[in-house]
Amino acid sequence: MKRKERRINKDYGYNRKCVCHYEASQKRFCYSQYSCASVLYERVRDIAKIIDRLDSGLDAWCLRDAIISVLRATHCVPRVDRMLGRWYLKTSVFYDFCPDDLILSCPNVIMPNVLNFVKKYRDFIRSVLYKVSVSWKNQYMPGVLAASRFLEEISNSLNGVEESIPCIYLRMCATLTEIVLRIGYLREIYQENPYVMFEELAFSLFTQKWVLPFSCMTNLGLVEKANSTVFDVAIYNTCLYSLVDFTIVNGEHLFPALLNGSNISMNLTRYQQEAKNIFEILLSQIRVVERDTDKTVQLTVYVEVWHVSALMWLDLYEALPQTSRVTFCLIIPGIFMDRYELKRAQWSLFHKNIAFELGKCDEITFSTKYLEFERTTDHAKITMSSFIEKICLCLKGGRMGLIFRKNVYQYSMIPHVPLYCGGDFLDVLPVRDGINTCMRMLLNVVHFLGDEVSDELTEEIDFVRLQCKFFMFNELRRVVRKMVLVANAVIDYAVENKDFLCEGIEDGRSLGICVTGLHSVFMTVGLSYAHPDARRLYRMICEHIYYTCVRTSVDCCMKGAEPCNLFDRSKYALGMLYFDHFDNVECTLPEELWTTLRKDVLMHGVRNIHFTAGTAMQKEFDIINSSESFWPMEDNKILRRSNIKVVIGKDGLNDVTSVYSSELKSLYIPVYNNLLLNRFNKHQQYLKTVGYRVLNVDTNLFTDKELDDLAVFKDGFSYHLNDLIEMYKSGLPFLDQGQANVFYFNDTVSLRLLLPLLYKAGFKVAMYKVLCNSEMYKHLDLSNPLPLIGKCSDGVVMHVKNIL
């Protein structure tokens, strides 16, 4: 039956055209009439009807106009966002193109072995996709903002047809299943027939139990493209490169990595005079990529604090605009921390050749060499107090990280590697001259909460009780095992297809299981962040992930895979496990499991060299409807499309003045937390006026249960610094890479006192994000409407960001 043609009724709504409808382009659609919160509730159905009248063939980005308007009433954002998401993705679920039909119609785009797999199992694939789509549409379909970010980051066109989310997941599942079935050691460990394997992968991806990086979802299974990659992070150690060498590397690796949306990390300290020019080149390339593509990229610059150029970089950091996607990361040696608290101490800064020699030293000889050069060579000096004050000022800006070099060396599984880089996006990995990367995957721990357990399971090993819920460790171990196999399948795929970043992963085959949803688990079961059970749960999660990763990696070698190239140089070859670096480590898993694992590692080796990370994957976690690993809120939504209309709200309902520009400027997007919104829906206006501070609320307005819940949210997540450190410390023995350390503090907390605590506790990456209470609320009056997109907002705005 022929589908009825749908057209836009431009006069719908208030029976008049708004400003944007006078433009020739039909890709714009305005809902600014519904900007006021009081009208929004009454008009939600009208909005749905208007969206229903959109021609499904139109550019779906027009729905962003609607979101810009409805975000003015942030207390109903989750509901409206999901409603718009349904319409936004309406054509994605068996509407215009069945995913398998679209895949099979593109033999010039999809790899032949993937096409053959889809052909062979086509009927079964259709039944699985139909079954999983029901659950996806009812529970896991993302809102319009998350969905738009998902699709714009991937932005594949299959012979002129935009790839839908189900089509992306089908391509991923088919490719991964085909790889596992073809590679012997993976097939033997997985021990599932292709039907079970495909179905399990489909349910995991559709329900966001775990998530692959956007670059992997973009390129996996497609016919080889020039300069494409499945890895989302790349570290470049350019210390030995000349300016000419850098130009070559930039053309062959750096710029292509940016075009793939990868997070780039570089040590630019030692260029000195050329550094500023190189930095400007990289910033201009970031602007080009973000202007001409839909990719979101990030640059991390490493700065060695013993180099004389460090002061220049800190000054440059302060001058960067707040909207810049650049993070600085200071590499700090042990001798710096030894002088940290000494009164009147001075710090020496060396010029290029001397600083380069120091950088080549391992941490054992670094201090000796530093003192020798301090006595015998010309150098600059700065008082420690002035230097630290400058560092803390940058840290308060929220885009500065620290790496404690001594802790990296002390706790690394690969000893005596002279050059290290790491940071907030990629974790601490050994880097030789050149490139290094990692296969990261996001694990959403919310999925392991259950309401009941089997009598056959053992408490404390297979599950733990959390208030009225159970956290299922047996299921977590099963899922993590499959994730390690999938990660190895992707790495093998990259090597096989000559991924242009594969040279950075071949030696260590590093993978990172990144935890997210932890805070959502705490809030769901009613645990406060400072509760001992919360810290214990996090430690157990890290322990089970690390054990399962190493166990699976060893099993790969037992089934015929070769140990990674770095195995013989690692401490694994000596029979060590990562937590052996720490004293008095509490392990929940039985000792016999660890003993057997050690023996097997010595006998067979490990396929991978790094496994677990506390770092959340910033871009990917936004689609999973959960919290970051330690940060309780959804991240700032980024709207960058050039055809977005910025609505300037003014007093009065009928004023729908709109301003267009080629680039989106000065658009404030609020951050909201679903759990807080749902539990305190009727109290939002009141809570906003008291700044969400528990001690300031009128207890007569709340029930006892609501007061208990409010205590869990802890003054709008303003946790005590000691609680944060104790939480982070609990997982350290099982995190062999970096950890996402988010510190939200008030003015009474000194960052100067925080750094020694982190250093002595054994943190390798000291900072990930620092949010200062006064900085976050400096320009916001919580008792008045917030200046977000217009003048109206009465939602939970914990943090806002000015976005280009």
Curated annotation (Swiss-Prot):
Keywords, ordered alphabetically: Host cytoplasm, Late protein, Virion
Entries under PROSITE patterns matching the protein: RIBORED_LARGE (PS00089)
InterPro entries: HSV_RIR1_betahv, NrdE_NrdA_C, RNR_lg_C, Rrm1
GO molecular function: ATP binding; ribonucleoside-diphosphate reductase activity, thioredoxin disulfide as acceptor
Keyword Glycoprotein belongs to the record: no
Gene3D superfamilies: 3.20.70.20
Alphabetical GO biological process terms: deoxyribonucleotide biosynthetic process
Domain of life: Viruses
Example of a GO cellular component annotation carried by this entry: virion component
Pfam families with a match to the protein in the record: Ribonuc_red_lgC
Keyword Oxidoreductase: no
Protein localization: Virion; Host cytoplasm
Chain's role: Does not possess a ribonucleotide reductase activity. Betaherpesviruses probably use another strategy to expand the dNTP pool in a quiescent host cell.
Similarity field: Belongs to the ribonucleoside diphosphate reductase large chain family.
Name recorded for this polypeptide: Ribonucleoside-diphosphate reductase large subunit-like protein
Encoding gene, per UniProt annotation: RIR1
